[in-house]
């Protein structure tokens, strides 16, 4: 009975460790690709003199500083999008929550909140507001293009 219990517990622990390993590995790969993409974006902004990144410590300090900027910004934009979707579901008859007006309001609120809540607190990242508007606008258009609003993309009726 005890051997059976320990054997069952070992399999559960092994399965949990495999799932955790896959989760950590895929997260590390994602963060690596994100880092390369952001490094390229920062080089483009520096080359065209649209941004200045003056925080330069060790690799891990830089990763933490610039990574937290991106992660906090993502959470702000994610929260705004979900809040706007919630408002649209709760007020379906309101003209502000339909069509292009809805997307313009979502984009404006997300960009403004990102700038005032996140960007102004990171003193070593100097990017003008209009450049942030263009970058977030491009990402918003990509989101609309690649993740269209629909009930079920696999519904073939």
UniProtKB/Swiss-Prot annotation:
InterPro entries, alphabetized: SepA
- Output a single Gene Ontology CC term carried by this record: plasma membrane
- Domain of life, per UniProt, equals Bacteria
- Keyword Iron-sulfur in record: no
Keywords of the record, alphabetical order, are:
Cell membrane, Membrane, Transmembrane, Transmembrane helix, Transport
Pfam families per the UniProt record, alphabetical = SepA (PF17080)
Q: Where in the cell is it found?
A: Cell membrane
Q: Which residues cross the membrane?
A: 18-38, 63-83, 100-120, 122-142
Asked if the record carries the keyword Methyltransferase, the reply is: no
Q: How does it sit in the membrane?
A: Multi-pass membrane protein
Q: Which family does it belong to?
A: Belongs to the multidrug resistance efflux pump SepA family.
The record's function comment reads:
Involved in multidrug efflux.
Q: State the name under which the record lists this protein.
A: Multidrug resistance efflux pump SepA
């Amino acid at each position: 009975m005890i051997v059976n219990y320990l054997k069952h517990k070992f399999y559960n622990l092994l399965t949990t460790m495999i799932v955790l390993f896959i989760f950590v590995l895929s997260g590390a790969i994602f963060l690596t690709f994100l880092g390369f993409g952001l490094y390229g974006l920062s080089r483009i902004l520096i080359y065209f003199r649209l941004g200045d990144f003056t925080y330069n410590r060790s690799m891990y300090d830089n990763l933490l500083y610039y990574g937290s900027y991106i992660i906090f910004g993502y959470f702000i934009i994610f929260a705004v999008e979900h809040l706007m979707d919630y408002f649209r579901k709760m007020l379906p008859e309101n003209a502000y929550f339909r069509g292009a007006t809805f997307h313009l309001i979502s984009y404006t609120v997300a960009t403004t909140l990102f700038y005032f809540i996140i960007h102004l607190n990171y003193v070593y990242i100097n990017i003008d507001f209009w450049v942030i508007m263009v970058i977030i606008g491009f990402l918003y258009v990509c989101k609309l293009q690649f993740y269209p609003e629909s009930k079920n993309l696999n519904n073939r009726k």
